[in-house]
């Protein structure tokens, strides 16, 4: 799956509530104003503030430090996974996202 609308539809059909943000700054504001968010899916390529910067900013906030973050990225070159994990991702999935793989990762991180 490549786009946010397809991804949101799959998750909503499985009973999940999906909140979306168009930029890294919006994502941080959304997380700060919605304390019951259980997990974040983070695109690396975003305007204003990319996913790496956004994850660093999230991890600097004590109330969000333990929030599971799954990085979703078309960047699948050698070293990209490590860069995502170093920036604060809990998990890394390359696009196009395999639905079963994403659901498995969500189950893993939501049930910790």
Model regions: which residues?
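Charged docking surfaces used in two-component/phosphorelay signaling
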Residues: 5-13
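Acidic, metal-coordinating helix/loop segments flanking the phosphotransfer/catalytic sites
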Residues: 20-39
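Receiver (REC) domain active-site loop signature in two-component systems and cognate sites
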Residues: 46
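Short, glycine/charged-rich "phosphate-handling" switch motifs in NTP-dependent
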Residues: 90
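C-terminal output helix
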Residues: 97-106
């Amino acid at each position: 799956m490549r786009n946010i609308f397809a991804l949101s539809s799959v998750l909503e059909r499985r009973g999940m509530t999906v909140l979306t943000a168009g930029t890294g700054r919006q994502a941080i504001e959304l997380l700060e104003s919605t304390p019951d968010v259980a997990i974040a899916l983070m695109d690396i390529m975003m305007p204003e503030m990319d996913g790496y910067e956004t994850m660093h900013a999230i991890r600097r906030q004590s109330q969000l430090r333990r929030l599971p973050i799954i990085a979703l990225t078309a960047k699948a070159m050698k070293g990209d996974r490590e860069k995502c994990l170093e920036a604060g991702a809990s998990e890394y999935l390359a696009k196009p996202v395999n639905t079963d793989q994403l659901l498995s990762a969500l189950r893993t991180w939501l049930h910790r």
